[in-house]
Amino acid sequence: MCGPAMFPAGPPWPRVRVVQVLWALLAVLLASWRLWAIKDFQECTWQVVLNEFKRVGESGVSDSFFEQEPVDTVSSLFHMLVDSPIDPSEKYLGFPYYLKINYSCEEKPSEDLVRMGHLTGLKPLVLVTFQSPVNFYRWKIEQLQIQMEAAPFRSKEPCMAEEVCSMSWYTPMPIKKGSVVMRVDISSNGLGTFIPDKRFQMNINGFLKRDRDNNIQFTVGEELFNLMPQYFVGVSSRPLWHTVDQSPVLILGGIPNEKYVLMTDTSFKDFSLVELSIDSCWVGSFYCPHSGFTATIYDTIATESTLFIRQNQLVYYFTGTYTTLYERNRGSGSWIRVLASECIKKLCPVYFHSNGSEYIMALTTGKHEGYVHFGTIRDGQVSFEMLPRQWSVCEQIGVTTCSIIWSEYIAGEYTLLLLVESGYGNASKRFQVVSYNTASDDLELLYHIPEFIPEARGLEFLMILGTESYTSTAMAPKGIFCNPYNNLIFIWGNFLLQSSNKENFIYLADFPKELSIKYMARSFRGAVAIVTETEEIWYLLEGSYRVYQLFPSKGWQVHISLKLMQQSSLYASNETMLTLFYEDSKLYQLVYLMNNQKGQLVKRLVPVEQLLMYQQHTSHYDLERKGGYLMLSFIDFCPFSVMRLRSLPSPQRYTRQERYRARPPRVLERSGFHNENSLAIYQGLVYYLLWLHSVYDKPYADPVHDPTWRWWANNKQDQDYYFFLASNWRSAGGVSIEMDSYEKIYNLESAYELPERIFLDKGTEYSFAIFLSAQGHSFRTQSELGTAFQLHSQVDVGVVLADPGCIEASVKQEVLINRNSVLFSITLKDKKLCYDQGISGHHLMETSMTVNVVGSSGLCFQETHLGPHMQGNLMVPVFIGCPPGKRLAFDITYTLEYSRLKNKHYFDCVNVNPEMPCFLFRDIFYPFFLIQDLVTGDSGSFQGSYVLLVVGGGPTLDSLKDYSEDEIYRFNSPLDKTNSLIWTTRTTRTTKDSAFHIMSHESPGIEWLCLENAPCYDNVPQGIFAPEFFFKVLVSNRGVDTSTYCNYQLTFLLHIHGLPLSPKRALFIIMVSASVFVGLVIFYIAFCLLWPLVVKGCTMIRWKINNLIASESYYTYASISGISSMPSLRHSRMGSMFSSRMTEDRAEPKEAVERQLMT
């Protein structure tokens, strides 16, 4: 609607002069606290943008968040850190982006402010919260946060100053697998300028890509940079539909006659106008009675990975590229048309995911009237099913024609609530609420909506019993709204019906029947905003019966008058609301402003508390004459003056929020400014910290229950040495890494408010107290039997439970008469009735607790420097089941100690593996397990019962195989008759069917059998040592442990050595070994007996050979010298005789020596 509708003239003002003066005085008085806040606190705000890794230090740049993979740009720097507690051989990666942080105050340059803040000690603290993924079958459910301290960095711009001209603070922008939605909370360290905390949405945009020129562009269409006024001025607002807390990219259509949508990945802090690349075709047929064609995108729904749109009767979807969620090839290349043969008249959102999937509903007209197309989205894959599966809704409720107007899905009950319009012959149209169960395919008619609006007769609400009188105005329902936490159901149209049990409905008479609701914005935390067809805004607190008009109203008149006086850039005299939505329990508007023929699209907060307070004060005030003047006083309808929460327990045990802390490395520079290398090292340290968290899911428990223990385990003793190096500026690389700066936090303190959510295990309690200071004298005495007087308070507190059969609450009142106050102690407890067992964080039951101070709804406000805050109504979602962050681990440390104590010895494998110690086959195996709480750091012995099964195994790690169900039964069941048991125990307790043993920490232990048909029987040794075997062991407490809702399942490998051989193989080895041994003995004896003879024979053979050689030499010489003279011959004979004699003389002593040695 156009701007004037947002700035109504209001009712005619009284023309009495004093009343006009009082109105002006009222505006000043109501803004007085604001003026005081401006005087004492500068209106400063944090500013955060995203910068790529390579653009650190550049001014005026902001990057889009679409890169999702770690970058290898920091590993070379870690190799220089030789004198640091880290291991340079580890793999350190970085993230693609940094967070650049500044702040600004009104009428002051930002550069001067940031520089002043740095010099006064200001340091931004950044808390990044990773949203858990939808598909818990692929990713672990966890509530993870990392707190970082921003590092100061000088700008790269030219500077004439000696130290710094402009600067900013930087922290890494971490990315976690499975998470695409991240909240960034910026706060101050308490020094320097006071700056209120601020939250930013930093979500991954999977609908962006780089073109050939390295420019970023949208994959869904073409971005437009000119926001023409005709796109927004005079256009009706429309709802913003998305999966709550899971959608990284929001999309909003409704621009007339254009294929344009608004897209944002920062919840409209910034946005883009995109023309979608769809065909815009329209196919008319006899079953699809469309009267015309338009290019307008009517319905838009955003999920975790996929966008849905409806144009005319056509439905399209586009899946983003999210490598952190699934494979890269899941992203769409273009818009995909679904339900091509159907005529779709409306898309209905499903606000919450369940069972690892998200959902969407499409309502048809034409040939499949009376059916709902139910869409399921998981990991970017979309599938539709037509429901009901057999007969249409019309046929099952017994009418010939009907039309489904709206559909609401209650995920926890697998139920569709359908608003059905039906015709009965010539009668007028009637409306019913129909329930359809998607699991059982059962349909039930829940409620017949009255034909006419009831006559309230001045009452705020009216119970619909069928006996009340009615007006002549027909009911025209348009939709159904269900809050899964408190089970409240609203049927809305030109009326409001409310129910908590789907059977009995209450008519809320404050909403005028002359108006018609267009859509409802839901916070799911107890507040609902209503937008009518005439763009009026109404407000409702769930569970109460008052409906407040926010716009147009007297309160809005006062508020906008003050804003225009302050020349706020968020308000104008001509404005159009595009949508109304909740974010973090706060109501926001997306508004198009027209100032001096210039348009601007802004997101602004709707100050609900201020509007209600202004409206209350403008309607209820007194004029008292004192002397010669009138005194203005306001009536305070709030039953208390002060409300505080006390005795709040440590939040992490109930919120299941895991938090890490990471500080930047210390730079060895006089100015304290970081450089690109130190920031890159900061990136690598944060990455490694989160990597340690992701891999801390080993079945073998560490001696110290902390993911960071292994990081510093070998360097803690040298901490003083590293401190000495840093103190003397001798640390390598110019940075010093402090081990205590990277840790997991287990002792978060309560923030004096109820937690965002509460998880309750079996029989768990949550206790807190509410302190209320009453207005005036709110106590009375009353005599009761047995006491003289009993003190009673006029201030009462009520606790409303959505499921009283599952949880219970007790309230104890303590009257503090001397302080005119009351202390209410409230305890919420699980009743152990509504949940069986489940995996940690899976399939939790959703319910809620609401605490109301009687008579305070919409009337009580607390003044703060950030504005008024509504009090008296507290609503907390409660999740019943196995909380996230709890796991079962094999206590290898105590198991080894206890085994050594009981067996009197311990023998490890020959090849020792510290990560997987061995156990000897013949020893009794005493397993112990730990319940580790990853959130609080608690780690204690598992005291419950469990079933232990060997589900796989193999002689080596490479030959491991999983056993079939039949094999698992034969290898583990005491009922087995096939001689296949692997182990046994003296425990007599078994499951109900006696199939398996039930064990506990008090069990007598396990004896290994490996019978004849077991896989570990008769294994061939891989060497000279006894055979080994690896058992894959499954431990589960499902169905046998009643102490918890948690279905603990642990699978780990057990290394057993010293397995015995089968009798046949043992006999064979003995026979072979004995044969070899006997053969060796016989050979040795024979060798000892025959050796002297062999030596003697060898000697004689040698002597004969020598003689033979000498004889041959003599005869050869004689024949050659026969022709010589006789003297020569005679001389030769004498020489030869002399030589022979000399040879014989040498041989005789040699033979004598050999005989002596042989004897």
From Swiss-Prot:
Disulfide bonds join 44-105, 159-165, 288-343, 394-402, 638-860, 806-834, 882-1046, 909-918, 1010-1016. Residues 1-35 form the signal peptide. The keyword ATP-binding does not apply. Keywords: Cell membrane, Cell projection, Cilium, Developmental protein, Differentiation, Disulfide bond, Flagellum, Glycoprotein, Membrane, Signal, Spermatogenesis, Transmembrane, Transmembrane helix. The chain crosses the membrane at residues 1066-1087. InterPro entries: CATSPERG, CATSPERG_b-prop, CATSPERG_C, CATSPERG_Ig-like, CATSPERG_N. Residues 36-1065 are extracellular. It is found in: Cell projection, Cilium, Flagellum membrane. One of its GO terms (biological process) is cell differentiation. Residues 1142-1159 have a biased composition (Basic and acidic residues). Glycans are attached at residues 102, 355, 426, 574. It is a single-pass type I membrane protein. Belongs to the CATSPERG family. Auxiliary component of the CatSper complex, a complex involved in sperm cell hyperactivation. Sperm cell hyperactivation is needed for sperm motility which is essential late in the preparation of sperm for fertilization. This is Cation channel sperm-associated auxiliary subunit gamma. It comes from Homo sapiens (Human).
